[in-house]
Amino acid sequence: MDENMNYTNTHKSLYDDIALWEKTDGRDLFAQMPLAPHVKGSPTVLDFGYGFGENLFALSNAYPNGKIYGIDCSPVCQKEVGEKIAARGIKNITLINKEVHNLQDFADESLDLVLLYDALHGGDGKGKYMLYEESHRVLKSGACLSILPVHLNNWRDHEGKKKTYTPAKIKAELAEYGFSYAGTCTQKGVHWEKCHTLYYIKKGNITFDILEKVDVMNFVKK
């Protein structure tokens, strides 16, 4: 286990299994994104809320010639992921380490893929709709918005009321923001919460196998 994690009670193989996922199933997941053919090998990608970097590193493996950006406001995540990038000598990941209320760091129609993985629940709902609007602005025509639909009983509607969302409701909502559903991938996305949340870590013996695996939802900008 990486000593920088400062975690106990996780299974000794967990972080080796995560590193393997980043090089295999995770890489394959992102290689299956419905990207335009001319950018397939070298897309410009944003992972909003990159956390501890699992998806960032898998994206880097899937698109070694791409430009991978990550946004996160957590100092703990910023430190750990930054150190891993340096230690691994990765050149195609750029971190944007700050709290944001829009995607102003990116120009209109400048991105080929945006990930909103475990990023749309909680709060008052305004953040979710901001991300819908801003994703549509920064994505190129025909580019992909990929969502990992977790915590669906803790999403908010336009009035800020907690609602239980379904895939059908997510599709309908994204259609209002100019996106059409483009299917899922053979590989499932991983919900990393149990790896990094003290509540679960205290329970002990966290293994890769018990992490929630979810079908991602891919949308294309109309």
Predicted regions and their residues:
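A short glycine-rich, Lys/Arg-flanked "PGG" loop and its adjoining helix->strand segment in the class I
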Residues: 129-141
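Conserved SAM-binding loop of SAM-dependent methyltransferases across substrates and taxa
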Residues: 52-64
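A short acidic, Gly/Pro-enriched loop at the edge of an enzyme's catalytic core
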Residues: 101-114
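Conserved beta-strand signature within the Rossmann-like core of class I S-adenosyl-L-methionine
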Residues: 142-149
